[in-house]
Amino acid sequence: DLAILPDGEGNLWLGTLSALVHFNPEKRSFTTIEKEKDGTPVVLKQITTLFRDSHKRLWIGGEEGISVYQQEGLEIQKAAILPASNVTKLFTNCIYEASNGVIWIGTREGFYCLNEKDKQIKRYNTTNGLPNNVVYGILEDSFGRLWLSTNRGISCFNPETEKFRNFTESDGLQSNQFNTSSYCRTSAGQMYFGGINGITTFRPELLLDN
């Protein structure tokens, strides 16, 4: 697997099984990031997702959880914004920033929100109504609800009420099982989630509860 993220300057960040790599297409050059700006070794394993937030920080998720870095050119330096919690060490599949600035992280053991302002983490799993603890993708709709792809369908989560509305193959999904890094929302609000039997697409505002 390979995680890919444009750096905003025409180049690409690549997350591999063992390293963070910067690719310059014009020079056709690859640079492996081995140290932080202060000389601290960069040790990353099985990177599954790369994300840049509204503060231009680089988030890296994978086997060992998440790391956050301030980044300038090829220089990175860890940003001390993560609270001390074992939750941030869970195998991470996806990272998403909602319109209100709250960061949501999907893992193999549920998903959680990171409220940087309050330095708080709140975790949700099957005991809270999530259909499955493996969360592959997170997208926000125009109503502020979060849509999550899992190993047991798609779930719509309302952050205000903390309630889940779950959808399965019987509701028209391609399958109950979805894939890592296979999700996107268009500027028009159409959502796409990729799974083992194809793609499920829909407009959230057009879905009606029975």
Language-model features: locations:
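Carboxylate-rich, polar loop motifs that coordinate divalent cations or form catalytic acidic clusters
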Residues: 1-210
